[in-house]
Amino acid sequence: MEIKTIQSEEEKLIGKNVFLTTLDAVFNWARGNSLWPLTFGLACCAIEVMAAGGPKYDFSRFGYEVWRPSPRHADLMIVAGTITKKMQPLVLRLYEQMAEPKYVIAMGSCAISGGPFVDSYHVVPGANTFLPVDVYIPGCPPRPEALLYGWLELKRKIQNPRVVKR
């Protein structure tokens, strides 16, 4: 009699887990379609981010229109431009203040590898040296279309969590 009770409790738990797995897909869909990026820029690539926010590219059709001025309300950081050693702790502090789950896009040659300034004494050789970068968008500066493609790749990674490796 005790064995049957344990089996029935296990069946109830299995049923709940299957339901939660289905909810995970819904949550990942919602996260991928409602990213809230942090508004801050480091250099010339930030100008391209501003250009991408205009009506010509219409990022709002993908749900990417809510730019947050506070890191506590944002879940996406776009590191766009040269990161100096003096700016590195501030960027890291902004990242630490962001809400979970949080994602990082490195946009431009300077954010990815230091760009043409990599041999300078004050330039950090890439955002991935101190931040977990999810998507890299190469270029100097990348076009707004490249930013849109990178955002869609991040959306794909969020909606398929097996792709995300940290």
Curated annotation (Swiss-Prot):
Record text on cofactor binding: Binds 1 [4Fe-4S] cluster.
Keyword Transport: yes
InterPro entries assigned: NADH_UbQ_OxRdtase-like_20kDa, NADH_UQ_OxRdtase_20Kd_su
EC assignment: 7.1.1.-
Record keywords: 4Fe-4S, Cell membrane, Iron, Iron-sulfur, Membrane, Metal-binding, NAD, Quinone, Translocase, Transport
Cellular component, GO annotation: plasma membrane; respiratory chain complex I
Subcellular location field: Cell membrane
Class of enzymatic activity (EC top level): translocase
An example Gene Ontology molecular-function term: NADH dehydrogenase (ubiquinone) activity
Membrane topology: Peripheral membrane protein
Protein name as annotated: NADH-quinone oxidoreductase subunit B
Organism of provenance: Carboxydothermus hydrogenoformans (strain ATCC BAA-161 / DSM 6008 / Z-2901)
Lineage: Bacteria, Bacillati, Bacillota, Clostridia, Thermoanaerobacterales
